[in-house]
């Protein structure tokens, strides 16, 4: 799977985590602090109709001890009775690329190559690091509870100074990654996420300038590219 597509899917996993997680998942065994955090997340999710944000993504290669940094914007519409879930990511650095996911279909447009990669998200699940992030996408609340152990790590300030609660999600069954971590703000929004793969490579996603419940035209989730673009099945 294309490297940018993998990184885009990590962001997608974070966004879809918002619609998959519920306070009820862990209330039975939660501490008072966890109950508060999960309750805030649950209320945020129920009130969320859309969001847009700036995205910074850092991929760290543990073998080379080197980072690759990506910057762009994300738009998100949760699943409704009338429409499937929709996510769009527009990368501006280091290269201009656009990714859109609507329901179980994704498209990745690479202008510099005049190429469009198309496929289904479920077929992407088996592709390396993408699998772990995409797991968030299709999990029901019951599946999330069954597959992850949630641990409260503590309070931390993330880049920009935002105060957050730091949670660690450890898969109960083998996956392509070891752990996922999220940093939840006072509104109940995961502002940062980190996935650590089995080889200790990490991908960290930071959301900034978040605008919630904005008016989004569904047409933005359909990529606009030249008719002569080369189509590649992902």
Predicted regions and their residues:
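Beta-turn initiation residues at beta-strand->coil junctions
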Residues: 57, 109-112, 194-198
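An acidic-aromatic
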Residues: 74-132, 203-204
